[in-house]
Amino acid sequence: MSVDPQQLLRELFATAIDAAHPQQVLEAHLPADRTGRVIVIGAGKAAAAMAQVVERCWQGEVSGLVVTRYGHGAPCEKIEVVEAAHPVPDAAGLAVAKRVLDLVSNLSEDDRVIFLLSGGGSALLALPAEGITLADKQSINKALLKSGATIGEMNCVRKHLSAIKGGRLGKACWPATVYTYAISDVPGDLATVIASGPTVADPSTSAEALAIIKRYGIEIPASVRTWLQSAESETVKPGDPSLARSHFQLIARPQQSLDAAAVKCRQAGFSTLILGDLEGESREVAKVHAGIARQIINHGQPLAAPCVILSGGETTVTVRGNGRGGRNAEFLLSLTDSLKGQPGVYALAGDTDGIDGSEDNAGAIMTPDSYARAAALGLSASDELDNNNGYGYFQALDALIVTEPTRTNVNDFRAILILENSKS
């Protein structure tokens, strides 16, 4: 078998992204009746690309407003595209959230609303609840991002501090008919978790949000605590009649990207093991992947080389150092430290939105010589991991993957390629 391992890994990553791109997946899910007036709103890293599809396919009058991350915009003719900050919200996100809410207020039962939702929407559609400031939300968001909290935990807190999340946007649209089309970036593809579920009923409680804040030792102002202890902080609950005409449709999820990559692997002659959506600390998840790789190499279990291990989901990083890098660089650095130059093992870890954390790269690639090459440059994988400096480590090896914004987001993508004769 003749294959360029790094090229194959890059092709797998591209295949995973393409399988979840709005241009490929949205049109088939739009309403059969595409005539008449429709109001389009949206939030997330894929919002602009999704809006382009609606403009292309809709036969009637189209107008609306979507918000996406800075640099993730795309030109639309009828739908306004605004950019704002992610992962920590800014004034632009606050302003557009107010405009979105105004746009859907006072609608009639004859109106139709299309809501285009994707990962990043929680930060991009930032409208603090009464008595809570944007600065409060920014501070709490930053603390959550560094705490190691899961995306579900973070979004539980976010929706209970919001005037637009947790079903509140859907309630504001009543009595119009609402069609939400979502691209999932969360493990389990829960509608209540994707961008904090602005148009779906939410079973979580303010008490749970307070428990999460306590669990991770996050300091909050007295005004925020008072709000979370009030009845008004509760989100829109299942059975609320204001959501009776709100419909939710998942159009892309991480599993279909993993499945598409697996097909590509088999076409190249590699068997695959799909581990699915994973959560946990990036460095610990990497150690599990390393253990599976060693089991394959040493014992041919659970499958024999040549093969590829695929996984997705959203890991977390508890920041202890002052280095640079997102969760995928952290994963790959921990994998490098665990395998220590294991022959015949190559790996890629990247974020399908094209941005790993807050850096300019999507991810990075590890090769069998990464560990030794870095050591020759005076870089210790273990020390750099302690400093959360995955970006700096792989930048020194010229091994960063830079894709620019992809305008979709089905979260992390990881592929470990194991060649035959990989034993030391």
Regions found by a protein language model. Give the residues of each.
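A glycine- and small-aliphatic-rich helix-loop capping segment at beta-alpha/alpha-beta transitions
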Residues: 53-62, 78-80, 101, 105, ...
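Gly/Ser/Thr-rich active-site loops/lids in small-molecule metabolic enzymes
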Residues: 132-149, 202-217, 321-347
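Glycine-rich, mobile lid/loop segments that gate access to catalytic sites or pores
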Residues: 105-193, 198-201, 378, 386-389, ...
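Accessory alpha-helical/coil subdomains and C-terminal extensions
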Residues: 176-179, 201-290
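Glycine-rich oxoanion-binding loops at beta->alpha junctions
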Residues: 68-109, 152, 157-158
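Active-site segments that bind and position negatively charged phosphate/pyrophosphate groups
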Residues: 269-349, 358
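An N-terminal, well-structured beta->alpha segment
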Residues: 1-41, 49-50
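Internal helix-turn-beta structural module
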Residues: 332-423
